[in-house]
Amino acid sequence: MFREFDYDNKPVVEIVNEIIEDSIKKGASDIHFDPEEKGINVRIRIDGELHDYCKIPESVKKNLTTRVKIISGMNITESRLPQDGAIKHLDDGKQLDLRVSSLPTIHGEKIVIRILDYSMSLAG
């Protein structure tokens, strides 16, 4: 499941979009961006289990974090306080809500995207 990107030639916008799209296609409920000393470890939660997805190098770390915060309506200048945001996403004609939270850590901001697919909820 591990994914590689051409970080030197691919724009961060496309990398973020691909991570989100691919996670949705794989049936993930969460995307975790865990900052480390030298980059970000991206993991996705499928059926309650976290799977390693990709490693983001240090050179892309700040831009990727900023991109996620922009599309979720967060304050990009604030990195010392927790924040919450949201993304409305249309996938094959169905509306998905993506809830985004950021939390400051010693190595940067930890970001979690929760994928909410209301079409999968129980209808009664």
Q: Language-model segments: which ranges?
A:
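N-terminal "pre-motor" subdomain/linker immediately upstream of P-loop NTPase catalytic cores
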Residues: 1-124
